[in-house]
C-alpha cells in the first residue's frame, strides 16, 4: 500500500503540471477548485478537468466496490484483478500522448479521466484491504493521526513509522513525477503503472490461494461430536457392564435358592 501511495504522487504531479491543474487522486483539491470557480473568485481556474476527474474517480471507486462487495477481508484474487486493471489503465494512458497527443483540452480531459478512474479503483481496493492510515490517495487523515498520537498529542505513538512513510512516499512520488514530466508526461505515467503492476504481482504471489468469496465452511461441532462419542462409549460402556453385572448376580442369585425339605 505504501508503494501505491508513491504511484499516486506521480499521477497527481502529472495531472497538476500537464493536465490543467487536475488532481487524479486527491479529490479534495478538485472540489476546492470547483468551489472557487463556481463563485468566480478565481479567474482562469479549470472546470472541465476537475469535473471529469471527479466523475471518473467516483465511477472507478463504485466499480471496485461492486467487485469487492462479497469478497472476504484482506487480499484476494479480486484485489489482484482490480489492481492489475489499474496498472493496465495507467499503461494505456501512458501511451495516449504518444498516439493522439495531449495538446488539446479534449485530449487532456480524456487523460485526466482515465487517470482518475484508475485512482478511484485503487482507493476503493485500498479501503477494502484496510491498512490503517494508508488510503494511497490522500495523506490528510495520515497527518492527523501522526500528530494526534505523537508525544505532543495523546502520546500513543502507534503507527508513527507507517504514517511517516506514507507522507514521505507521496512527496517522493510527486517529486519523481515532476522530474519525469520534464522529459514527457507519458514517461511519468508509465513509471506509476510499473509500480502498481509490481505491487499486484507481489501481492498475488504472497496470497495466491484465496478467491475473495466469504468462507462457507460448516461448523466444527459435528466433527467434535463424532470424534469424542466413540471414545466415550468405548471407555465407559465396558467398565459399567463389568462392574455392575457380577455384583448384581452375586447378590441376588443366593436369595432365590429354596431350602431342602
Where are these regions (language model features)?
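Hydrophobic core of transmembrane alpha-helices in multi-pass small-molecule transporters
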Residues: 2-11, 16, 20-23, 89, ...
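Symmetry-related core transmembrane helices of the 12-TM Major Facilitator Superfamily/SLC fold
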Residues: 83-89, 93, 113, 187-204
Amino acid at each position: 500500500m505504501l508503494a501505491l501511495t508513491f504511484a499516486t504522487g506521480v499521477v497527481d504531479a502529472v495531472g497538476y503540471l500537464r493536465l490543467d491543474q487536475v488532481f487524479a487522486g486527491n479529490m479534495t483539491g478538485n472540489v476546492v477548485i470547483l468551489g472557487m470557480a463556481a463563485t468566480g473568485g478565481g479567474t482562469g481556474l479549470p472546470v472541465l478537468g476537475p469535473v471529469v476527474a471527479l466523475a471518473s474517480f467516483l465511477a472507478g471507486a463504485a466499480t471496485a466496490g461492486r467487485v469487492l462487495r462479497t469478497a472476504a477481508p484482506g487480499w484476494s484474487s479480486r484485489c489482484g484483478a482490480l489492481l492489475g486493471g489499474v496498472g493496465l489503465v495507467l499503461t494505456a494512458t501512458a501511451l495516449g500522448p504518444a498516439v493522439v497527443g495531449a495538446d488539446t483540452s479534449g485530449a487532456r480531459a480524456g487523460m485526466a479521466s482515465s487517470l482518475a478512474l484508475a485512482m478511484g479503483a485503487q482507493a476503493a481496493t485500498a479501503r477494502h484491504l484496510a491498512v490503517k492510515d494508508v488510503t494511497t490517495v490522500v495523506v490528510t487523515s495520515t497527518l492527523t493521526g501522526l500528530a494526534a498520537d505523537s508525544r505532543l498529542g495523546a502520546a500513543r505513538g502507534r503507527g508513527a513509522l507507517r504514517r511517516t512513510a506514507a507522507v514521505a512516499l507521496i512527496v517522493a512520488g510527486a517529486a519523481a513525477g515532476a522530474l519525469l514530466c520534464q522529459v514527457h508526461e507519458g514517461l511519468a505515467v508509465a513509471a506509476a503503472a510499473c509500480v502498481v503492476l509490481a505491487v499486484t504481482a507481489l501481492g498475488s504471489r504472497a496470497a495466491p490461494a484465496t478467491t475473495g468469496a466469504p468462507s462457507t465452511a460448516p461448523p466444527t461441532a459435528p466433527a467434535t461430536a463424532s470424534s469424542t462419542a466413540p471414545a466415550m462409549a468405548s471407555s465407559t460402556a465396558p467398565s459399567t457392564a463389568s462392574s455392575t453385572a457380577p455384583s448384581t448376580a452375586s447378590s441376588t442369585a443366593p436369595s432365590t435358592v429354596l431350602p431342602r425339605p
